[in-house]
Amino acid sequence: MKRQFRGAAFAAAPFLISSAAHAQWSSPYTAPRNAVVDAAGAKSIEVEAGAGLLRVEGKPGLRQVQVTGTARSSSQQFLTRIKLIAERRGDVVFIKADIPDDERSYNDENHSASLDLVIEVPQGINADVSDGSGDTKITNVGSLDATDGSGSFSVIGAAGSVRITDGSGDLTIENVGGDVKVNDGSGDINVRNVTGSFTVESDGSGGIYATDVRGSVVVQNDGSGSIEVNKVGKDFRVESKGSGSIDYTEVSGRIDIPERHRDRRDRSYR
């Protein structure tokens, strides 16, 4: 392997807002949007976030979902219309950033509106997350099904399976107790320490980097960017590959990659 896993530094560092991201979402008018929802007996949490930063953090022993939000807008009038919906719907805790459609501009010349959310949930609860734009970090949940528009997206700790559909921005996934499936538009994909298999169903551009996957690694369709895998417990398969290199080390099972990559890559097989 010629390259170290890019996500390692990310995992070791705290979740930081870059100066560029902060400038993008900073607005002269802000207001708190907080809520607490009883989570006793809840099986899952559903989050619909729009523009803004998002954290979903699993906490041991927690019996409530605690939401700490900050509404931001370039207009006081717009600010009052940014709402937080937090309620129990049967065995689901539902959280929504309610930003009226006519205010969903992303820091254009007229105005900006966003709602940053930090959501603390019972550790291991299943999560369904939909996010528009802005950086997202999810930690210590159960299974996860997520859709993300733009911005970096990280998952650090999921007891079950993880499925992510991502538009643009780097994607980091670590410490997963089940399978991982990804559909990605652009940006690097970094995966580490997966108990199950890792499948990239579709990737437009950007590198794919995986290490410590106990199951198989399967790339069904990759447009451009390098693919590098290390320490795969079962098979490694690339079904369709555009431009970019393929490197692999310590693959225990069968290797099946496009013909043009085989001769120069077979030496990487242990």
Write out the residue ranges for each language-model feature:
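Bacterial N-terminal signal peptides that target proteins for export
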Residues: M1-F10
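Acidic (Asp/Glu) and glycine-rich low-complexity loops/linkers
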Residues: K2, A21-D131, K137-T147, S154-D166, ...
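Bacterial N-terminal signal peptides
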Residues: A9-S19
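Ca2+-coordinating acidic residues in Ca2+-binding motifs
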Residues: D212
